Amino acid sequence: MTELADYADKYQCMRMERRDGILQVTLHTNGGALQWGLLPHRELPLAFHDISNDHDTRAVILTGTGAEFSGPRVTNVGHPLFPTRPSMEVVDRLLTEGKQGLMNFLNIEVPIISAVNGPAWRHSELPLLADIVLAADTAQFQDSAHFTGGLVPGDGMHIVYPLLLGANRARYFLLTGQTLSAQDAHALGLVAEVLPADRLMARAWELAADIARKPKSLVRATRMVLTEHLKRHMQDYLGLGLYAEMLALMDRPGA
């Protein structure tokens, strides 16, 4: 078991605060919007593991900082994020972190509410894996970093979006770099509520408080049964997707 004091200040890319059993996790880079890179790729799996081992938390709110949930948006189509072949040491680390990240998120045994405060350009599958997804009316959802950025969408995108959108819509979304507005995402069933930005966090805390008041065993067991099918999909397909992503990275000139 862990306690909040053991990990609250442990990570550079997130702030954590807990009140009345509700843990708010705010993603950031140097106090601004999260800029995806090797640091959050390494830290998020570890943080989710710590959170999952803290039984004093009754509900989790995941949100971002400022005007974006996660960036930066990749707009240089045709210029891959990894222009040269990474070392096997880097590949090995990416595989391990990639396998742990989403599974550790799903292993948090209390309900998670995502409060998507703005565009999720990078790893938009993460907030969509929450039990309740709220979005500011300025939010957008895109996979800007994978296929259109020169990477195989094999680290969870290939699982989450087909489950949520259906196979054909998801393949179009991933192959074209389509952007979904908050309103589009709501109409397609990805988002439960779209709110004005200044109401987003209040609504997230309202929902979390309602969950946290319920019996602990009820809360934890419900989270377990609602995520079991997602874990099974991850177990079946995440490893293969990650290896496909890394294999394609090897088809690059050496550094």
Predicted regions and their residues:
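Glycine- (often His-adjacent) and acidic-residue-rich active-site loop
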Residues: 56, 64-100
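Hydrophobic/aromatic residues within transmembrane alpha-helices
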Residues: 25, 62, 126-128, 185, ...
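Short acidic-hydrophobic, aromatic-tinged amphipathic segments that line or gate anion-handling sites
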Residues: 134-135, 191-203
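Conserved CoA-thioester-binding segment of acyl-CoA-metabolizing enzymes
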Residues: 1-63
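CoA-thioester-processing core
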Residues: 101-107, 115, 120-174, 203
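Short, structured loop/turn "capping" segments at alpha-beta junctions
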Residues: 167-171, 180-187
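C-terminal alpha-helix plus adjacent terminal tail
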Residues: 1-23, 29, 69-70, 76-81, ...
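Charged catalytic carboxylate motif
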Residues: 39-43, 97, 104, 203, ...
